[in-house]
Amino acid sequence: MSASLAFVFPGQGSQSLGMLKELGAEKPVIVETFKEASDALGYDLWKLVQEGPEEQLNQTDKTQPAILTASIALWRLWLEEGGATPAFVSGHSLGEYSALVAAGSLSLKDAVRLVERRGQLMQEAVPAGHGAMAAILGLDDAVVVEICGRAAEDEVVSAVNFNSPGQVVIAGNKAAVDRAMELCKEAGAKRALPLAVSVPSHCALMKPAAERFAENVNAIEWKAPQIPVVQNVTAAIAPDLDALKHDLLAQLYQPVRWVECVQTLAANGAVNLVECGPGKVLAGLNKRCADGVTTYNLNTPDAVAATRAALA
């Protein structure tokens, strides 16, 4: 175990058609992990990830199992090749489920079914076109929170992802998000960018989904994590399994406190972070979240080799 090492797992937005293709051709564990997930889901997930159609891969109930499986395939590859066990794990949004699989808290089979259901319930909670998300760049967190309070009126809009200093994602009813974007621009935001997502994650509109999802979460067998998991809702390590599950459900309708998650890792000595997933989204965020933090990647054969060499 390496005390300075933490693995961080990305959420939605890291998917791309053909992800892990090169590694899949070289390392049997990649395709084997996808086969295990496919058997649990009842369709060929590797084929979908490699061949598409892309619109299907980008549906949240397909995206979530795809990113989780890709992340766990890379985790297994890391361990298989003698990589050190991290002192901590954490995941951004959906990535929290990948982190829990890595920590031994739930099986891959249960996890892919769980996040598929999570995607279905999220989609059902808000009809297509009624919800929206947007990234606000260049304003303080407190300003964005205050603007959302004003823009909501009788609808929902709130700050839902604190991704890095000066980068906050908002979500809610489409009209309220549009109002908040305009107010953010007036307040001096560098940019207010609508995100191409079908579901307004981590806001109050997801509370009904969380209530329904509790049944699925409680129906599977959980184990105490073998590696401490820093969770999104608290930016802390849950004291027990009940608290962990509670915070996992709350994450559906409460903000992802990613800046604080990275700061918690760094404060505990974990300054070498490995982004265990198919993209490099977190690497871009992490360096702005805490001083002295370095993020390594595993998304290509070259990245795996470079990370192994750097952390040997």
What residue ranges belong to the model's regions?
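Non-catalytic positions within long, well-ordered alpha-helices that form the structural scaffold/packing
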Residues: 79, 185, 266-269
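FabD-like malonyl-/acyl-CoA
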Residues: 1-144, 195, 272-302
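Alpha/beta catalytic cores of group-transfer enzymes, especially the acyltransferase/condensing modules
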Residues: 12-14, 41-43, 103-255, 311
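A short, acidic, amphipathic alpha-helical segment used as a generic capping/interface helix at domain edges
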Residues: 253-270
